[in-house]
Amino acid sequence: SEMCIRDRSPINSPKTIADNKYSEIQDDKFQLQPGDIIVTKGPVMWGFFGHCSIAIDDKTILQIEGPGDKPTTQSFESFKYNYASGKNDWMKVYRCSYPGAGKKAAEWVKKNYENTNHRYLVTLNLNSKKFTYCTKIIYQAYKFGVSEKSVKSYGLHIISPYAIKDNFIDPYKLRLVKAY
């Protein structure tokens, strides 16, 4: 078998750890798909660990970051730099295994959250859109954009970023497609 040897020569210009790590992750040939769910370490807010966003096409993610914020879109490349290039950062990309589900979820998010004034607030109501948070957008995208059968059903509930994958039901289960 052939072995690939990477050039480990010293870098001439002084760079930060983030720049070095980012140069490794930026041209990784990974192809994002609409509906992909990106989970990161993120800041710890309100006792929540982690952060997540959803791909609305093959280059763009939509997220809502924190108190007072509205949903924003960002290129996947810059999102990777922000959330996956730090020394202790990590990022996982999950994909719904059900054919066509990701595209439907992405369309729903574009229609219901892109360029809206919905605000960040963690509430127990998983059905409302006026106040939302990172995982709630993803949960709704699959529940309302794909199928009520794709995710677990709750009364009043909060879903944390690290628990998002556990809320999907067969045959809609998420699979890990990329880790940074």
Give, region by region, the residue ranges found by the protein language model.
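Short, small-residue-biased leader/transition segments that mark boundaries at the very start
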Residues: S1-I5
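Mixed-charge, Lys/Arg-rich low-complexity intrinsically disordered regions
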Residues: N12-F30
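Glycine-rich catalytic cores of cysteine/serine-nucleophile enzymes that process amide/ester linkages
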Residues: F30-C96, R119-K129
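Extracytoplasmic/secreted envelope proteins and their assembly/folding machinery
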Residues: L32-D36, G50, G102-A106, K110, ...
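Low-complexity basic/metal-binding stretches
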Residues: D7-R8, V93
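A structural motif
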Residues: A84, Y98-N117
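Sec-exported extracytoplasmic/periplasmic mature domains
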Residues: D57, G66, K110-E114, Y139-S147
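Activation targets extended, charge/polar-rich intrinsically disordered C-terminal tails
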Residues: S9-T16, L124-Y180
